[in-house]
Each structure stands twice: as C-alpha cells, then as structure tokens.
C-alpha cells in the first residue's frame, strides 16, 4: 500500500511522526486532501484541525489541533511546521474551555471599548459637522450683510 510520512514540528520539537494513507488540512485557500503521490506543494495553514488516516490502521484517524503554520508536501513526505500543535489525546479540554471563556471575555470588553470610541468618534464627527455648518452660516450672514 502506498503511504506518506507525516511530521508535525513546532518550536518545542517533533509533535507527530507517523505513516499515513490520507491527510486532510485547511489552508488559507481552503480545504485540501492529500494522498500518496500528491504533487509537491507548500501552503499556509489556517488555525484548524489536521486529520491523518494512519497506514497501520485504516479505521484509525489521528486528529491534531494546528495553530496555523505551513504544510510542505514533497515526494510523499509531509511536513507541517506550526507555532503549536496538539494531538487530540493530549488536549486538556477543561483548560481549553477556560481559555475560550477568557478569550470571549476579552473580546467582549474590546468590542465595547471600540463601540464606545466609535460613539465618541461619531460625536466628534457631529461636532465637526456642526462647526462647519456654523462657519458656513456665519460666512453667508457676513457676506449677505455687506454694504453694497
């Protein structure tokens, strides 16, 4: 059976190294399925899951959370370089939930802050428009009352 070697590398070292018959990844340009004999390529990855169907057990799929990075396919050797990557079995789900809640809280606070700034900016725009309208009116009055 044709196979590929798949390695996932992070700054912390090699995170995954197995033989595979199929890989599914999400690149910046969309989803990609890779089989043995795939053309050589390099593509930037989205923050998404990586699906690897292993050769030693066709019914077994390894799922890896990849934090962006790049994928290189060259002669049935697939290298994924990412800032971080975790296999499904290594992920602490409760810790991930806490991180999600923190991120949502920060996002909500930042959204409120942006909206408050936008409101102030809108107010500033309203003030500026009023000042311009006042200057135009004063100018028209001044010109209109000139002695001819």
From Swiss-Prot:
It is found in: Cell membrane. One of its GO terms (molecular function) is ATP binding. Its main location: membrane. Signal peptide: none annotated. One of its GO terms (cellular component) is proton-transporting ATP synthase complex. SUPFAM superfamilies: Epsilon subunit of F1F0-ATP synthase N-terminal domain. It comes from the Bacteria. It is a peripheral membrane protein. Pfam families: ATP-synt_DE, ATP-synt_DE_N. Keywords: ATP synthesis, Cell membrane, CF(1), Hydrogen ion transport, Ion transport, Membrane, Transport. F-type ATPases have 2 components, CF(1) - the catalytic core - and CF(0) - the membrane proton channel. CF(1) has five subunits: alpha(3), beta(3), gamma(1), delta(1), epsilon(1). CF(0) has three main subunits: a, b and c. Belongs to the ATPase epsilon chain family. Produces ATP from ADP in the presence of a proton gradient across the membrane. This is ATP synthase epsilon chain. The gene is atpC.
